[in-house]
Amino acid sequence: MSQNIVPKSAYREIMLSGHPMMDVRAPIEFNKGAFPSSTNLPLMQDSERQKVGTCYKNKGQDAAIALGHSLVNGQIKQQRVEAWLEFISLHPNAYLYCFRGGLRSQLTQQWIKEAGIEIPYVEGGYKAMRQYLIEVIDEAPKQSPIHILSGITGSGKTDFLLQRSEAIDLEGLAHHRGSSFGRYHEPQPSQINFENNLAVSLLKHQERAEKCLLVEDESFLIGRSAIPKQFYSGMQAADMLVLEEPEGARLNRLLNEYVHKMHSGYVERLGEEAGFDAFAEYLSQSITGIKKRLGGQLHDEFQSIIANALNIQRQRGDTQPHMEWISLLLTKYYDPMYQYQLDKKQSRVIFKGSHQAMHEWLDEYSSKG
């Protein structure tokens, strides 16, 4: 590796190690997508970048470079260099990158060097690293067999996945549980960040040399995060494992996920009153999201039961009344929908069983030559 340039051959190690990187692109570029270990410390802010870009189109590169120097000068330049130096002091082995590994990387590197510090920039920049991660995702179905973990709503698929080293939690990466009630407290990542995080997870999975890749049975969209097409095609052709769980355990799990966790999460973020109001709105909006499938009359019945359960919870702190609408949700919506979908995939099912039986089956599968 050249002292000042990190070659493309290092991309895999960068992603696997979570190597700290300084992204000097403008915030608007960074917010569309970046890498898990990167921090945005821009050479130019959005408005400055826009002016330089317009100048480049109208007057060419030399004029654009001159304008860039005039916009990022004096105290502004000093503040940005100081921010870079502070980052490097915290991460002495850091790399930097811009969009293509061109002028912005070179100029940033030069200014930092003038302050007495050497920092390498990544060859090809964001664009080349992003392309590398896209290829990782597209090639993943060929790297190891995919097994799809299915199971009726509330069967604990995510809990199970988190206990398995061969698993990747797609819903965790998407910050969404993949259903009408599936949103998290924090917003979903951008599509690019979802894909980049998936690619890094796949690289780590490959590094562990697992016998298979275990992922949950998902729709193409998890909330608003789209599973990349090549990877999703691999999932659609994969063998399936069906996790089975008694109804009582399913109800308790959904009460915990939809009520206890969501309520406490909103209260933690917003305070007692505003948090409860946000939690109530989450339940109401989630039912409204499936109104067309439920039908108007059943939707209204759900809203009435939920409103009553919320009133009791607010007054007495008792969450058990929520069990009524959760049970109804299973029998009238989730269970029939799941059975319909599973019937279409029966030919792909290779094992069904409880949590313990599923662990034993996968352990045996992994131990085979």
Swiss-Prot record:
Major enzyme class: transferase
Record keywords, A-Z: Selenium, Transferase
Catalytic residues of the enzyme: 98 (s-selanylcysteine intermediate)
Reactions accelerated catalytically: 5-methylaminomethyl-2-thiouridine(34) in tRNA + selenophosphate + (2E)-geranyl diphosphate + H2O + H(+) = 5-methylaminomethyl-2-selenouridine(34) in tRNA + (2E)-thiogeraniol + phosphate + diphosphate; 5-methylaminomethyl-2-thiouridine(34) in tRNA + (2E)-geranyl diphosphate = 5-methylaminomethyl-S-(2E)-geranyl-thiouridine(34) in tRNA + diphosphate; 5-methylaminomethyl-S-(2E)-geranyl-thiouridine(34) in tRNA + selenophosphate + H(+) = 5-methylaminomethyl-2-(Se-phospho)selenouridine(34) in tRNA + (2E)-thiogeraniol; 5-methylaminomethyl-2-(Se-phospho)selenouridine(34) in tRNA + H2O = 5-methylaminomethyl-2-selenouridine(34) in tRNA + phosphate
Domain of life from the UniProt record: Bacteria
PROSITE patterns in UniProt: RHODANESE_3
Similarity comment: Belongs to the SelU family.
Function: Involved in the post-transcriptional modification of the uridine at the wobble position (U34) of tRNA(Lys), tRNA(Glu) and tRNA(Gln). Catalyzes the conversion of 2-thiouridine (S2U-RNA) to 2-selenouridine (Se2U-RNA). Acts in a two-step process involving geranylation of 2-thiouridine (S2U) to S-geranyl-2-thiouridine (geS2U) and subsequent selenation of the latter derivative to 2-selenouridine (Se2U) in the tRNA chain.
Protein name stated in the entry: tRNA 2-selenouridine synthase
Species: Shewanella sediminis (strain HAW-EB3)
